[in-house]
Design a protein with these regions (language model features):
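Short amphipathic alpha-helical/adjacent loop interface patches that line ligand
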Residues: 325
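Short amphipathic alpha-helical segments at helix boundaries and their inter-helical linkers
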Residues: 303-319
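Residue-level detector of conserved catalytic or cofactor/ligand-binding positions
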Residues: 334-341
Length: 341
């Protein structure tokens, strides 16, 4: 029996409550507690799938992984009596996997988007459309937020509650192509964004600090000195004029005009004040570590050389992409299997 924990979103459970009428089979939602929930705040940053993707390191890692995965062609093969194989081009599933997954949905785009779903939320879903012979003729992508896996207490059967634009229905497991990421219960995967939420929030906080750092022309670059005492009204007038003329990005580089024997002495930014730059670099590496993406693939060439980039790229395909290819291949063989394929 699977752990009974709360659903990814209370609204979704509310939408599905009518499906579990009195007398229905007792069931439990099979949902991961490690996911980003609406309104989640961490380090003063609102963190969800949308805001996390606005962090450049997250976008770059997911982008390169999803595009690289989708760029590799997917073919359906038929086993022959002599043990060899050939492409099963006459099978409807061949075109679904290789060319067009559904109306207005190229196979490339289906793979790319579903891989993004796995890399962000930990799970990707598509509904199988079958013909009269039971062959898969379409794969209709489902948004993970609209799918709630559940398990029957008595039989252990997995099924899926789906909310399609307000239309609620159940689908048996054999009608769903479900690609989970790394998980703990054998059904669903952890959300990578949720697992990396502290690293992401720290990176986003450092970006916010950088925005504020430069918002008013960065930190003070110098001080005004005078040998004459200033009265309160003169001091207030000086502050107001200085802010109006020299603060802000639009006034950056303006020529400073001083009066009354005042002098401007430049000061440098101390290491503590500039530390956020190092924090931003480290957080980029931290996100790349979560996704096992070499830094040069997300445009960070600081530690790369001509000789090691080639080896890093080979390692990327062997240690990062190959597990994804195997995962998809085996789940598709299990869930899209046809007798002659």
């Amino acid at each position: 029996m699977s752990d009974t924990i709360r659903s990814p979103a209370g609204l979704l459970v509310g939408a599905f409550k009518n499906l579990f009428a009195p007398g229905a089979a007792k069931s439990t939602t099979v949902s991961s507690q490690f996911r980003l929930t609406p309104g989640m705040m961490l380090n003063g940053v609102q963190l969800n799938n949308v805001t996390a993707m606005q962090y450049s390191a997250v976008w770059a890692c997911i982008h390169v992984l999803a595009e690289t995965f989708a760029s590799c062609k997917c073919y359906l093969y038929q086993k022959l009596p002599d043990g060899s194989r050939r492409r099963a081009v006459e099978n409807p599933l061949y075109d679904v996997l290789t060319y067009v997954a559904a109306p207005n949905m190229p196979a490339y785009y289906l793979r790319e988007t579903m891989q993004y779903h796995v890399l962000s939320g930990g799970n990707a879903y598509a509904e199988k459309v079958l013909d009269s012979k039971g062959e898969v003729t379409q794969l209709n992508m489902l948004l993970p937020v609209n799918v709630l896996p559940a398990q029957d207490y008595n039989t252990g059967e997995i099924y899926y509650n789906v909310n399609d634009r307000g239309k609620l229905y159940k689908l048996p497991a054999e009608k769903i192509l479900h690609i989970p990421g790394l998980g703990y219960n054998g059904v669903i995967g952890y959300s990578p964004l949720a697992m990396a939420r502290r690293a992401i929030s720290l990176g986003m906080s450092s970006e916010e600090l950088g925005n504020k750092f430069f918002e008013n022309g960065a930190l003070a670059t110098g001080v005004l000195e005078t040998d004459k005492p200033l009265k309160e009204d003169a001091w207030q007038r000086l502050k107001e004029q200085f802010r109006a003329r020299y603060e802000g990005r639009s006034n950056a580089g303006s020529t400073m005009i001083l009066e009354g024997g005042m002098k401007f002495n430049r000061i440098s930014v101390n290491p503590e004040e500039a530390q956020f730059l190092e924090t931003r670099k480290y957080q980029t590496e931290e996100i790349a570590r979560f996704y096992r993406v070499p830094l040069h693939l997300i445009q960070n060439l600081e530690k790369s050389t001509y000789s090691n980039i080639e080896q890093q790229t080979i390692d990327f395909y062997q240690n990062t992409m190959l597990p994804w290819f195997v995962r998809w291949e085996q789940f598709m063989n299990c869930l899209l299997y046809t007798s002659d394929a």
